[in-house]
Amino acid sequence: MKCIVGLGNIGKRFEQTRHNIGFEVIDFMLEQNRFSLDKQKFKGAYTIERLAGEKVMFIEPMTMMNLSGEAVAPLMKYYDIDIEDLIVLYDDLDLPQGEIRLRQKGSAGGHNGMKSIIQMLGTDQFKRIRIGVDRPSNGMAIVDYVLQKFSNQEMETMNKVIEHSARAIEAYIESNRFDRVMNEYNGEIK
């Protein structure tokens, strides 16, 4: 079973913020396929569905961002999900807005949600989709910037990014070839 995790903070006030872009991709995929997060366990909201003939678990941690591993690790253990079947979607300040980067593995890169998952799983050897949100250009504090809602103009770009990220996940589920999907989907979304 594949496990797709979107990172974000719970609560209405965090919707459509830079830090919640992982949730936005999961929500988009759920809506497109008429699925819903109908289960809760181990601090995570989740569902298990069939997509492209594969069993897939979608997870949104119900913790704050920096405790995301407390939801992901126990759910993966409970359902006996292999680390190679995990993909985590999250915001990345080091990528320009409108760009995604798929990676087979890597460090947390300063992202506290990823730090928590890596710590709880005991490895950084899992797939991820980094979604560019850019860095603040006006000297704004990082914490304020990532918790700020996207402007309407930014949201137009991010809606394309959300859809592109969802297509990348679907392409991986269909092909089971992450290397090919990386080659096709990495980069700027036009």
UniProtKB/Swiss-Prot annotation:
Enzyme class, spelled out: hydrolase
A biological process term (GO) from this entry: rescue of stalled ribosome
Keywords annotated in UniProt: Cytoplasm, Hydrolase, RNA-binding, tRNA-binding
The name this protein goes by in its record: Peptidyl-tRNA hydrolase
Enzyme Commission identifier(s): 3.1.1.29
Pfam families on file: Pept_tRNA_hydro
Binding site for tRNA: 14, 64, 66, 112
Annotated site, Stabilizes the basic form of H active site to accept a proton, chain positions: 91
Record organism: Staphylococcus saprophyticus subsp. saprophyticus (strain ATCC 15305 / DSM 20229 / NCIMB 8711 / NCTC 7292 / S-41)
PANTHER family xrefs: PEPTIDYL-TRNA HYDROLASE
UniProt-recorded Gene Ontology molecular function terms: peptidyl-tRNA hydrolase activity; tRNA binding
Subunit structure: Monomer.
Domain of life assignment: Bacteria
Main subcellular location: cytoplasm
One cellular component (GO) term of this entry: cytoplasm
